[in-house]
Amino acid sequence: AGARKVKSALEAQQLPLADLPALFALVGEQLATVMGGSSGVLMSILFTAAGQQLAEGGTLPEALKQGLEKMKHYGGAQIGHRTLVDALEPALEALTAGKSLAEAADAAAQGAESTARMQSARAGRSSYLNQQTLDGVKDPGAYAVERVFAALV
């Protein structure tokens, strides 16, 4: 629902593409209103915090990293918990270290792949599933992050 809402706003030319802080704030607001469950709130936190960092003069990688830190703070997920954090954090670490978008995409893919080997999930919807169900399957949120970064390359 969130991606469709943003895509619809983009197609209707309702997004302030030339003003990244405003864009991120608007995306955060829209995600909070259309995405269900905790995912919408957490993605809203990420984009809103990133927008604030951009407004204060931060670079895009720094802003996204700040958004991730806020999301982790409020959501509680960390690397190794089998969530989108396992793919997003390594990708953003690569970008903040000055690596290329392709290298960030590789980091996201490796992070997503690592979730398929995790014995249990400590956060997110996957935490309700048993080991047999999780074995060999990437976390859906981590996989989504992997696909987003792959599409950007």
What are these regions (language model features)?
Residues 1-153:
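N-terminal loops that bind phosphate or other acidic moieties
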